[in-house]
Amino acid sequence: MALTYYRTYAQAIAKVQETADVTRAVAQSVNGGQGVIVVRDLTAQDLGAQAVAIPPGNFTVTIASGVVPSGKAFGIYGFELTTPFVRIANGNLVGLVLDTYVGGSRVKRVYLDVVNDSSETGLTYYIADKSIVMKQQIQYSFVLSGVNNTGSTITLMVNVLGFVGEPSGVTIIEQ
């Protein structure tokens, strides 16, 4: 069986660099090879991601969805379940699955249960096989499903780890 995920950033560093390089190449291609392309970290704002309320029992929630903006490319190398951290090991959340859809088709299914490291800092899943790279005008969505056994609603945030390739000077960060 082929390895599908890495446990640590140190193990994943080559895949992370490969994702950055491919994201840059795709962004260069969608911009007709013109201008300087920069690669920066993908943010929740890029994806429209936000914390979601996980109801008790079986659930399916959309973490983020949208369309890759013109002139840009998104490259994804991992996912991180962040605060407030709920210990999966204690059975609070089971069957936790994150599906990634690109252009309406599921391209990646991640079983977040398998990366339970019993820490209080969160769960991180680094993709070991093929990274997900999306070019401009491609529709995407990230859908989380599973079972919440806590008896109450939990608020969770799933960070999508990746890069944005774009022409230099496109992004303006508001202070």
What are these regions (language model features)?
Residues 1-175:
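Beta-strand-centric surfaces of beta-sandwich/beta-rich domains
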